[in-house]
Amino acid sequence: SKEKVELEKIDALYEQYNSTKDEVQRKAIYKKIDSVSGVAAKYAIANEYDKMMSAMGAQGTNAFTSFEQTVYTDDIPSASLDKYLAVQAERFRNPVLRIFHTELEAVYEEKNRTLDNDGRKVSETLFSNLFQKHNYGLQTTIGTVEHLKNPSLIEIRKYFNKYYVPNNMGIILSGDFNPDEVIAKVDKAFSYMQPKPFDKYTFQPEDAITAPIVKEIIGPDAENLTIGYRLPGNKDKDALLADLVGQILTNGRAGLLDLNLVKKQKLLRASAFTYSLIDYGILYLSAAPTSGQSLEDVKALVLNEIENLKKGNFDDQLIT
């Protein structure tokens, strides 16, 4: 098709862009990408997917990527399920990356926001220190500025062909439908997909943490403290215990941090939760001082509640 010719030109231009170091030349190539994208756009319907979803009454169309998953979501009327499955089956058959460069600009904006976000900087620092051998800490989901500056549509397609296979994907549906009928429809719509081998992620076990790792983040937000404990992965029985620990420490009403620190106004805020992933997890504690307190004061108060937890100094109803 005429569009395919232009899209292939864009692929080639991105490869040229990636291999070019001179900034003046890179700007000239990117200008060509913009120009060819404009030509390619004449052969397609703008916002085609959103329009199709809206036409069938869909809401909440979105997608996100986290450590171990990329998820595509829609909320659709049950009467539109057949149409929806037909669209999704074609969508994942051979993705056409029509507006890649404009979407990339949106990701750039998101990345720039994270560079000035204290909470994000704290989280990334915590992960990078707890996980010095695992990708949880060796890289971020959004990537580096250099990654975003040098995209490759060819590599993206290689990734898609390698990992978007039925033995590495799941279709999750909930709502008003007959599950037996819907499973048969899903099987039929996606029957063209064939399982393929793919490389599962491997890693070296993390070394034991034998002493506290202390890092300081400088930023515009008010002072606050974050403490992280590395946990086993979500298939380990201790992961369930860790989740229970998080609930005992804080549940918004009667956890140790809630009762002893927040309600007694010893701290401005304090919370704990478990971040559970496949290979490892984190018990994540966060607290903010009241007026006149130092972060050392905050740490002492939080760690004291950890000691109360160890000693069983809490209401039994928290675990019944």
Q: Can you annotate each of these PLM segments?
A:
Residues 1-2, 227, 237-249, 257-259:
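Active/ligand-binding-proximal structured segments within catalytic/core domains
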Residues 33, 96-112, 178, 198-211, ...:
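Acidic/histidine-enriched alpha-helical segments
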Residues 95-98, 115-116, 132-137, 141, ...:
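An aromatic/glycine/proline-enriched structural segment found at the starts
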Residues 148-152:
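Short, charged, amphipathic alpha-helices and their helix-cap/turn boundaries
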